Design a protein with these regions (language model features):
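Conserved activation segment of eukaryotic-like protein kinases, specifically the C-terminal portion
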Residues: 299-315
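Catalytic-loop of the protein kinase fold
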Residues: 256-272
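Conserved short submotifs of the Hanks-type protein kinase catalytic core
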Residues: 191-204
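Short beta-strand micro-motifs within the conserved protein kinase catalytic domain, predominantly
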Residues: 180-194
Length: 413
């Protein structure tokens, strides 16, 4: 799609993420989030990196008490971001979106501005202090997400917009199984140095899957069977995986309750915090849907081929219209991987995947030891017909009944 100006591209991208009657943008929570300047944070090692952004650990917080305090330099500090070409063209578009977030329609359609009251500003200051106190008392560990300084300069604009969009989503998605946004970078989200202050992830599901696979391998050895004849360790490992699958479904259920489509559910985007709780993160491909924009069959005309092919529903791979049930398909592949401890379609190249999975309805083999409920759950959720797929509310109920299914480890492989 061609745009005459950068601002036109801006506006398109914002409206592509949020409908005109956006529930997310209308929420005041974003405006109430505390802010930090980059000079107040000392960052450490790189924890993870995507195509556009990097996530770094926060090693120190040096809170400035007043805005007019001069920033103190610290030899430990690393520059958070320094793009030479600040994209001032984004300002008007960003301001327009920020204004929409602080407007409500009253009687007769009259638009009223919502202003931050003194109590709101006081609350933001208290929140800053709470964040610092929790960090200093070792009650919380944080990370920042920022635009990579090494990406193609032509992609910086898109990266900044994506990060600003993600901030909007996380501001309203306050749930135990979704990564927690704690604060945002001071200033305009479309300027250099903007960042998200997030709870730190301990590891990802990708890492946890490797750990489970190694544990499962050890349990299959003869000595393990002698030491654990009733298979209690197998049962515990199975229950741990089912419990994690339930938490993922609960987080996705909450996301869908806002009519948000996630579009990139995979092990790399599912983490575990320092206490072992599941956290869904990376909302760069998420979009808010408006039912008024849907087709007669309940689908939407959205960008195709979005996400990771291994977990991509057929309709999105075929560039057909789709809805949030593509997330349920992706979940079925993640669930199967958690149960089988093998990547789905691990030996398929792109052409084979397209011919056999997308067009041919080939699916992974379901293990015989799984219960009838789990077998049916997988088959329903990876059905080529999106209407056959269980909702996440239904998935939570189905899986909750499975947590104690294996009464004896002998029923497991």
């Amino acid at each position: 799609m061609n745009f005459q100006t950068l601002e036109d591209a801006d506006t398109y991208k914002w409206h592509h993420a949020f409908p005109e009657k956006s529930r997310v943008l209308a929420d005041r929570k974003y405006a109430e989030y505390p802010t930090f300047r980059s000079s107040e944070l000392v960052v450490g090692k790189l924890l993870g990196q995507g195509a556009f952004c990097g996530v770094y650990e926060v090693t120190k917080i040096k809170m400035r008490r007043k805005d007019n305090d001069s920033a103190t330099k610290d030899s430990e500090a690393k520059p958070i971001n320094t793009h030479s070409d600040v994209l001032h063209q984004l300002q008007n578009s960003a301001d327009a979106v920020n204004n929409r977030a602080n407007e409500v329609k009253g009687e007769n359609g009259i638009v009223h501005k919502l202003n931050l009251e003194e109590s709101d500003l006081l609350k933001k200051t208290e929140d800053r202090e709470d964040i610092v106190n929790c960090f200093q008392n070792d009650d919380a560990k944080y990370a920042i997400k920022i635009v990579n300084t090494t990406i193609d300069p032509n992609l910086v604009h898109d990266a900044m917009i994506d990060l600003a969009i993600e901030a909007r989503f996380l501001a309203v998605l306050d749930h135990p199984n979704i990564i927690r946004l704690r604060a945002i970078g001071h200033g305009d989200p479309c300027e250099d140095g903007f960042f998200l202050l997030l709870d730190r992830i301990g590891d990802t599901l990708e890492v946890r899957l490797r750990q489970w696979k190694m544990a499962d391998f050890r349990m299959k050895k003869k000595i393990s069977k002698i030491m654990d004849p009733k298979g209690k360790k197998k049962i515990s490992l199975f229950q741990e995986r089912i419990a994690a699958a339930i938490e993922i479904a609960m987080g996705m259920q909450f996301i869908h309750s806002f009519n948000i489509i996630y579009r990139d559910l995979k092990p790399d985007n599912i983490g575990f915090d320092m206490k072992g709780r599941v956290k869904i993160f990376d909302f760069g491909l998420s979009r808010e849907l408006d039912k008024d924009d849907s087709e007669k069959d309940g689908t939407y005309k959205l960008t195709g081929c979005v996400g990771s092919l291994r977990y991509m529903a057929p309709e999105i791979a075929l560039n057909q219209s789709y809805n949030n049930k593509i997330d349920n398909y992706a979940y079925s592949m993640v669930l199967w991987e958690m149960l089988a401890l093998v990547q789905p379609f691990e030996n398929f190249d792109v052409k084979m995947h397209y011919e056999r999975v997308v067009k041919g309805d080939y699916r992974p083999e379901i293990a015989e030891y799984l219960s009838p409920v789990l077998k049916k759950t997988l088959k329903c959720c990876w059905s080529p017909q999106s209407n056959d797929r269980l909702t996440f509310a239904e998935l939570v109920i189905a899986l909750s009944g499975e947590i104690n299914t294996p009464k004896r480890g002998k029923g497991l492989p």
